[in-house]
Regions:
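Bacterial N-terminal signal peptides
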Residues: 8-18
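Outer membrane beta-barrel
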Residues: 105, 123-198
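Residues on the lipid-exposed face of transmembrane beta-strands in outer-membrane beta-barrel proteins
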Residues: 84-88, 145-150, 177-181, 211-215, ...
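Transmembrane beta-barrel architecture of outer-membrane proteins
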Residues: 64, 79-83, 141-145, 174, ...
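Transmembrane beta-strand segments of Gram-negative outer membrane beta-barrel proteins
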Residues: 26-73, 95-104, 159, 187-191, ...
Length: 478
């Protein structure tokens, strides 16, 4: 932890080096690099004042500085990330409007390993994707999105041009164009095309093209269909989705059919609220209808999930969530998977039970306490015995006055698994504490500290048992 003083100094420095910036629509400072943060209460609050370009048009900027320290008795690693988000109000253009948006990141590894020799083991324990990218890109730049949206410039058409995430049945990230056209009040058609975006692969010759249709059959019924042609890493795939959304009294039902080449899956989900008691019931089903061989696509990139050899399977889930006595709520869910043929590492029979108990407004009005438990029972196969996993934890968050939020929590994970001819049980205990402070509308600060104590490295080196992470964020908003 010898870099802790550096962390404190850098946190202060962030307040002075950040330039003017402003808000985005979702009101949170999370980025694609921090979606895995275990602390959810600590989201930055943001204003929507903007900087005036004209009498009726503003530009909104947000500059977020992030420092991360990871350390144990074996090694230390310090990373610095700088995020910039910008968008404008809609500007009149012809018979419609145009607006612009961008989201970018720059980063550096303060004591990174990319300049060290392979014989210097000290620097390689924390090697990650940032270190790899810095090996060939100074400041590891990433453009998450940067596009112009033309709404109504072409009659009844919304057109996105640039880098963006599709917002149809798939959420592919593209460098290209996406056009949606309304054909009356009931029908919308769309088409898109361009190059897929990858931060890890060479995609010079890769392309993605597709289109779809949404039909509002009745007031409560919508049907959609989408086809995509993927030409990625020299593998050509046909990707088709059909979806039905049906609203019902106090709930909704979704049915979906997906076909990736010859492999088809069916998904169904229903949510219903019992009005008299406030009980929420959720039912889910997923089924792989075809045997998947190695001849099917196994593309590993932001476009599709990995699809390797797999047998047919059925997966079910049922959940219930109930609030009671004004300050309490409890949830319970059961999930099971049944494989119809040969099992492998990623496709095995299992059952799972998870539960949650929440307390709102006790002991004070702005207190939230949540207890959770998650148990997996993974069945044996021809090649392995049955395994178990147990996780439980508690999280507490508290608002302190108008300007501050604090939180703390702990979780425990126990894994039972086969190792050579031995059955092992290893555990991981995590603790975290953090806070968020917003003294004025244009400034928000966050700090989060976590510690992980694990048994997994006992046979390697006990100095790896305890790992610490410190996160410091500064958000300047105008």
């Amino acid at each position: 932890m010898r870099y802790l003083s550096v962390s404190c100094m850098l946190a202060c420095l962030l307040l002075f080096i950040a330039v003017g910036a402003q808000a985005f629509e979702n009101g949170a400072s999370n980025t694609p690099d921090s979606w895995t943060q275990q602390v959810s209460p600590g989201q930055f609050k943001e204003s929507y004042e903007g900087i005036g370009l004209t009498d009726d048009t503003k530009v909104y900027l947000t500059l977020t500085s992030r420092y991360r320290l990871r350390t144990n008795d074996y090694a230390d690693d310090q990373d610095f990330y700088q995020y910039l988000r910008v968008h404008t109000d809609s500007v009149k253009l012809g018979d419609g409007t145009v607006r612009f948006a961008a989201f970018a990141r720059f980063a550096d590894d303060i004591d990174g390993d990319h300049k060290k020799s392979w014989g210097d083991d000290y620097y390689y324990y924390h090697r990650d994707a940032l270190d790899t990218q810095l090996g060939y890109d100074d400041w590891a730049p990433r453009l998450y999105h940067g596009y112009a949206q033309f709404d109504g410039v072409i009659k009844n058409t919304v057109l996105n041009v640039g880098r963006f995430y599709l917002s149809h049945q798939n959420t592919f990230q593209l460098d290209g164009a996406d056009a949606s056209v309304k054909l009356g009040d009931m029908v919308e058609v769309y088409a898109f095309g361009g190059k897929p975006v990858s931060y890890y692969y060479d995609i010079d010759d890769d392309t993605v093209f597709g289109g779809g249709i949404n039909v509002k059959v009745m007031e409560a019924t919508k049907i959609g269909a989408e086809y995509v042609r993927l030409d990625v890493t020299d593998i050509e795939d046909d990707y088709t989705k059909l979806r039905v959304d049906q609203a019902i009294p106090n709930g909704n039902v979704v049915l979906e059919y997906t076909l990736l080449n010859d492999a088809a899956t069916v998904n169904a989900e229903g949510v219903y609220e019992v009005a008299a008691t406030g009980t929420i019931v959720t039912l889910k089903y997923e089924g792989l209808l075809d045997e998947v061989d190695y001849e099917n696509s196994y593309v590993v990139n932001p476009l599709t999930n990995t699809l390797l050899a797999a047998s047919k399977y059925n997966k079910y889930e049922a959940a219930v969530y109930q609030s009671f006595l004004q300050n309490f709520a409890a949830g319970l869910a059961y999930e099971a998977k049944a494989v119809g043929g040969k099992e492998n590492f990623d496709n095995r029979d299992y059952s799972r039970i998870k539960g949650k108990f929440d307390i709102f407004g006790l002991p004070s009005e702005n207190t939230y306490i949540s207890f959770s438990v998650d148990y997996w029972d993974i069945k044996n196969t021809a090649d392995s015995n049955d395994n178990e996993r147990l996780q439980y934890g508690v999280q507490i968050s508290q608002k302190v006055g108008r300007t501050m939020d604090v939180w703390a929590g702990t979780s425990f994970n126990r894994y039972e698994y086969d190792y050579v001819n031995d059955k092992r049980k290893d555990s991981v205990r995590s603790y975290y504490v953090g806070g968020q402070y917003q003294p004025v509308q244009y400034l928000s600060l966050m700090a989060d500290l976590s510690m992980e104590d694990t048994e997994f490295y006992d046979d390697v080196d006990s100095s790896l048992d305890k790992n610490y992470t410190a996160e410091l964020w500064a958000n300047i908003i105008f």
